[in-house]
Design a protein with these regions (language model features):
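Extended, non-globular alpha-helical segments
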Residues: 398-438
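Residues forming the flavin
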Residues: 469
Length: 481
């Protein structure tokens, strides 16, 4: 019997479960478990970590039967959604996301909107009666695929986008209309051709295959390797890949995306805590490029979806008996859950959450003690500002506290500079407009860091809480000049 490498989930049933994290990765196991619990999850399938290990053993070739099994599962997704992958009238689009067994926030790659072509983008526009949405999805896809799969520097796409906003005279891309976005797609494709000497792929299955290759390859990307070295994660584990039917947070003002924690990851308070963006896609929140809204803003914008989100997070926390990190998308008022995992937290939050969960009868005292590591207890000894002196001070800037403690040091404006300064014996504070997962080496070298953009749920904030670094986000950097 052929080895099983692909596990389907959808329509309330999944071939996996939460206890299969080693095989399905954390994300895949979470998607399977939420599906089995009857929570609203888009259909999809997980390619196992074993497939990734075999991919590298075989000289970057898929193990026997993997691709055929993936295509069979894709057919099941098509049937569930009533759409076709590559169908010019009812196009199914998918996301291709990494998911290792150990959480590695932002360290590997994700590609959204796979399946968009010159034909399917017109079908998407006609089906949704929303040309702007279709063109916005296409320009996002070309830039993401172009950078992750085809190796064009992300900054080159951002420069073209910045130039277009300046031409039109708008502050943000949400103000660009369908015509402007079509022009961006053309400009992005021209950039890809110029940089790679290749045409942007216009065949959906080719897009999918190359996206899967790119996500497998990101397991040995520089930032993923650095992260694994820091946290003792073996190279031999490999990553799973989740191919999931796209749901869209960028379809208008009743659509959005967000990241939330079932309790405050900084303080441990029993408050539903998170951030969201309306008319946006998931990477917009965690990338820290745009400053998000608090998650409870959804109660006003999409009240029914917010009620369902509240019900869902309570159900999941009770089921997992831990504080959870959630990702979700709302498409025209309907909630879809995209991820659940045990949330990273500060040491102070870890102690409070453990004590509170004992009082609530969710865990035993023994479990509470086992959940607190020495590094988390050490945070109680971290330096903080003297409150009396702080009250007398005249701060140059203010922001939100996303990481533990306080820090002092000389400013470094790039991650590489932070590494160099630390090697010379200097304490460093890394200052950036926003951080990305590519900055992990500089974040580890710094005593603390601050950013102008991003929120409390961005990848930077998640990593800061894990590496025990002080982080302040949403600081007006002009105040520091």
């Amino acid at each position: 019997m052929a080895k099983k490498y692909v596990y389907y989930f959808g329509d309330g049933k999944a071939e996996g479960a939460s206890n299969m994290k080693e095989l399905l990765g954390g994300k895949g196991a979470g998607l399977a478990e939420m599906t089995n619990l009857g929570i609203s999850v888009p259909p999809g399938f997980t390619i196992s970590t074993e497939a990734c290990v075999e991919y590298y053993k075989n000289g970057k070739h898929y193990p026997p039967g993997m691709w055929d099994a993936a295509l069979k599962s894709l057919k099941r997704v098509e049937q569930s959604m009533g759409m076709g992958f590559g169908d010019p009238e009812r196009p199914l689009l998918v996301s291709v996301r990494s998911g290792a067994r150990a959480s590695m926030p932002g360290m590997m790659d994700t590609v959204l909107n796979v399946g968009l072509t010159t034909k399917t983008v017109e079908g998407l526009a006609a089906k949704t009666r929303n040309d702007r949405f279709a063109q916005d999805s296409y320009r996002r896809f070309v830039s993401m695929y172009g950078s992750i799969v085809m190796g064009v520097p992300r900054e080159h796409f951002e420069a073209i986008l910045k130039q277009k906003k300046a031409e039109v005279g708008v502050p943000h891309e949400t103000h660009l209309d369908a015509r402007h976005l079509r022009e961006l797609v053309s400009n992005f494709k021209a950039l890809v051709k110029e940089e790679t000497k290749k045409e942007f792929p216009d065949e959906p299955l080719e897009q999918l295959r190359l996206a899967v290759n790119a996500v497998f390859s990101s397991w040995f990307g520089a930032r993923a390797v650095t992260y694994r070295r820091l946290y003792g994660i073996p190279d031999s584990w490999g990553t799973a890949i989740n191919v999931v039917a796209m749901v869209f947070g960028n379809m208008g003002e009743t659509s959005g995306t967000g990241v939330a924690f079932t309790r405050d990851p900084a303080s441990g308070d029993k408050n539903f805590f998170g951030e969201c963006l309306m008319n946006a896609q998931g990477e917009d929140v965690v990338a820290g490029i745009r400053t998000p809204l608090p998650v409870n803003a959804l109660a006003k914008n999409v009240p029914e979806a917010y009620k369902e989100l509240e019900h869902t997070y309570k159900k999941l926390e009770k089921h997992y008996r831990d504080m959870l990190d959630l990702e979700f998308t709302i498409q025209e008022g309907k909630l879809y859950m995209l991820q659940t995992r045990v949330g990273k937290r500060t040491g102070i939050a870890a102690v409070k959450i453990a004590v509170d969960m004992v009082r609530e009868g969710l865990i035993s005292k023994q479990e509470a003690v086992q959940r607190i590591g020495p590094e988390q207890l050490a945070q109680y000894l971290y330096p903080i500002f003297d409150t009396k002196e702080e009250s007398k001070s005249n701060p140059l800037g203010k922001g939100l506290p996303a990481g533990p403690g306080a820090a002092a040091g000389k400013i470094a404006l790039t991650p590489d500079r932070a590494v160099t300064m630390k090697a010379a014996g200097t304490r460093v504070v890394l200052v950036r407009q926003e951080t990305s997962p590519d900055d992990i080496h500089g974040m580890n070298a710094a005593a603390g860091f601050l950013t102008a953009r991003g929120g409390m749920t961005s990848h930077a904030a998640v990593v800061a809480r894990q590496v025990n670094r002080a982080l302040t986000v949403q600081v007006a950097l002009t105040d520091l000049v």
